[in-house]
């Protein structure tokens, strides 16, 4: 990790900014001083599960310990980013708010911004209007911003996907005054994962109506890199990056795509993600499915587009139907369809 950190520092980039993460103790803080970073994350677990059962401290002892390391960081001119671990199981008014208020006093005294990362460690957070604290994402962000007076730009949301709410919770945190949400490439992370970066890039565009300079074709490049270089297996149906996220199998849907892509494609995936809409050919594809596959796979445009009435379409459709009549039950692969097309063409 130290070698990776120094290699990144040697590149000399301003962004993305390199930060570290430590436990709230002197031994870990010594490593931060040696690293030469301008900001460090500090683990400040907030729930009684962590304070009593993991660290065997009282709430006062925990807060004093946390504040001691924060003060040490400020004395060195290092910006603290306090990770309020397990906030969705913490006593919000009994511990979270008083602690956040103390941090804001220190921030005002030192002149350095202290960030607060609200960590939904176990994914218990909910975005529903009227939900009670500590599980309420709106309540957590509103409370930190308005009661503890934490500036929006110093608030972060950190979610987990244990209950399938990681994206909706992150979007809700934005809407209630949290300027930043933590993401990971493809949503990789502990247990069920963290919030996917690609999801929040699309969510941002949906909420703001603009990409603000983002090139989302990079999402596709990132997915390809993660598969090729790191060996990450992406679920075929994972939104925006999965192999089949914009692939339709139903013949009636394929017919709609032929008439107007907007009918059955979520947006212009070719333009925005460099991923043209595709049709998988199987027993239900019919003439429309085969026609769309031919035009999309061979990237035919304008006068080159093959109509549904073309003899090549009907011949290929009949060959596919014959395979399924003989007992095939898997989707046709692009490569085998291409071989069939070239065989028909030579005949």
Q: What are the functions of these language-model segments?
A:
Residues 10-13, 71-78, 101-109, 142-150, ...:
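Generic secondary-structure signature for well-ordered alpha-helical cores
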Residues 5-11, 26-153, 171-176:
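Alpha/beta enzyme core
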Residues 210-347:
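A mid-to-C-terminal "edge-of-domain" accessory segment
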Residues 1-26, 278-281, 285, 296:
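N-terminal capping/small domains of soluble enzymes
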Residues 17, 41, 180-183:
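Short hydrophobic alpha-helical runs that function as membrane-insertion/retention elements
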Residues 18, 22, 59, 89, ...:
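Hydrophobic alpha-helical scaffolding
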Residues 122-265:
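Catalytic alpha/beta core domains of metabolic enzymes, predominantly
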Residues 17-20, 82-83, 154-158:
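Short catalytic-loop micro-motif centered on adjacent basic/acidic residues
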């Amino acid at each position: 990790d130290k070698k990776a950190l120094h290699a990144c520092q040697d590149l000399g980039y301003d962004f993305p900014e390199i930060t570290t993460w430590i436990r709230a103790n002197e031994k870990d803080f010594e490593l931060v001083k040696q690293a030469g970073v301008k900001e460090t994350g500090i683990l400040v677990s907030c729930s009684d599960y962590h304070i009593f059962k993991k660290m065997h401290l009282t709430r006062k002892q925990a807060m004093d310990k946390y504040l001691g390391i924060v003060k040490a960081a400020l004395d060195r001119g290092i910006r603290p980013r306090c990770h309020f671990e397990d906030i969705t199981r913490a006593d919000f008014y009994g511990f979270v708010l008083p602690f956040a208020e103390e941090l804001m006093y220190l921030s005002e005294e030192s002149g350095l911004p202290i960030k607060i990362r609200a960590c939904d460690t176990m994914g218990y957070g909910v975005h529903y209007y009227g939900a009670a604290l500590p599980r309420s994402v709106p309540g957590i962000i509103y409370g930190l911003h308005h009661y503890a007076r934490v500036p929006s730009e110093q608030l972060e949301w950190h979610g987990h996907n244990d209950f399938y709410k990681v994206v909706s919770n992150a979007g809700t945190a934005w809407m209630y005054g949290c300027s930043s949400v933590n993401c990971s490439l493809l949503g990789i992370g502990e247990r069920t994962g963290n919030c996917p970066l690609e999801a929040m890039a699309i969510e941002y565009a949906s909420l703001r109506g603009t990409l603000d300079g983002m090139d989302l074709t990079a999402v596709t490049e990132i997915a390809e890199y993660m598969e090729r270089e790191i060996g990450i297996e992406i679920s075929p149906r994972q939104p925006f990056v999965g192999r089949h996220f914009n692939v339709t199998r139903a013949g009636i849907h394929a017919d709609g795509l032929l008439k107007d892509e907007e009918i059955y494609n979520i947006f212009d995936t070719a333009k925005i993600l460099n991923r043209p809409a595709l049709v998988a050919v199987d027993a239900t594809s019919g003439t429309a499915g085969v026609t769309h596959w031919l035009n999309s796979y061979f990237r035919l445009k304008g006068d080159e587009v093959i109509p549904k009435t073309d003899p090549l379409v009907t011949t290929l459709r009949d060959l596919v139907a014959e395979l399924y009549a003989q007992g095939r039950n898997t989707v046709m692969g692009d490569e085998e369809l291409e071989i069939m097309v070239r065989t028909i063409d030579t005949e």
